[in-house]
Amino acid sequence: MSLKGDRLKDEGSRLQVTAAGATAGLVARFVIAPLDVVKIRLQLQTHSLSDPLSHRDLHGGPIYKGTLPTLRHILRSEGITGLWKGNVPAELLYVCYSAIQFTTYRTTTLLLHQTLGEGTLPPSAESFVAGAIGGGTATAATYPLDPAAHALRRPGQRSRVCESVARRGPDWVVRRAPVGFFGVWDRAWAQIIPYMSFFFATYETLRPHLSELELPFSSSSAVARTMASVMAKSRTFPLDLVRKRIQVQSPTRGRYVHKNIPEYYGGTVGALRTILQREGLRGLYRGLTVSLLKAAPASAVTMWTYERALKFYSGVGEKGEEQRL
């Protein structure tokens, strides 16, 4: 298997793809956890950074200004472990999500070939459809883990809504299930399906072309991953912000780091309208910088690990077949 010009949909068996996807999710989650914590803190901040008067009604919660100041504040107030807050359920989420996503992506591609014939759809359209179905299926299967991990990542040191999976997990399940698990499922789909569609379509399109260039350190795949991630995240970021805001809509939202999180009515459209009215257009892109800083390495690490894990598992499979012969 080549890691240069071949397309992901043409590589590996189903079991190898599943194992490689799980490995990629495990590694990627640990690497980008600190940036994810910072991103969520910024996304849940509803006051204007440019208007000091908007800070008058804040009580107790810190005011985060930018990626590095937020990072320093978390380190100072919560220690280095605060940057990996909620990482246990998040690791489980990423492992399951990545395994299901890559397996579904591969399976969908094969079904499209069998149903429509190979080469009927343009490669970018094929990747767009497979990416949408892969992302949607993985989101549906793993969504209960998302609000659990999100709840554990957002509290501060002195006002913890969930202190640990062992201590607060059972109580959280009783209070939130089943509506709390799936209450914003549609918002998750609305964000992840277009994101994964754009990402895989862009990545699969750029990857073969960039592999023909003589880039230093054989970085063509890394460049393709980074470009695809930045483009996809920029297009869908407001939907991700709305999903995070709606996930904290519970009676305990006043106990989080930010005390002034408003209630949103009318679903995704209503939340978008409320944010535009209260915070302006800039409010829809709060935390975009750190999100892009997170998305680029997250996608790069995920795809890099996936490709090499797939190569490893494929090699193991080939050796096993040779030994049986």
Swiss-Prot record:
Disulfide bonds: none
Compartment(s): Mitochondrion inner membrane
First and last residues of every Solcar repeat: 12-111, 122-209, 216-312
This protein's UniProt keywords: Membrane, Mitochondrion, Mitochondrion inner membrane, Repeat, Transmembrane, Transmembrane helix, Transport
Coiled-coil portions: none
Pfam families per the UniProt record, alphabetical: Mito_carr (PF00153)
One GO cellular component term: mitochondrial inner membrane
Subcellular location, principal: mitochondrion
Membrane-related topology note: Multi-pass membrane protein
Transmembrane domains' residue ranges: 17-35, 92-108, 127-143, 184-200, 223-239, 287-304
Domain of life: Eukaryota
GO biological process: transmembrane transport
Family: Belongs to the mitochondrial carrier (TC 2.A.29) family.
Matches recorded under PANTHER family: SOLUTE CARRIER FAMILY 25
Function: Mitochondrial transporter that mediates uptake of thiamine pyrophosphate (ThPP) into mitochondria.
Protein name: Mitochondrial thiamine pyrophosphate carrier 1
Name of the encoding gene: TPC1
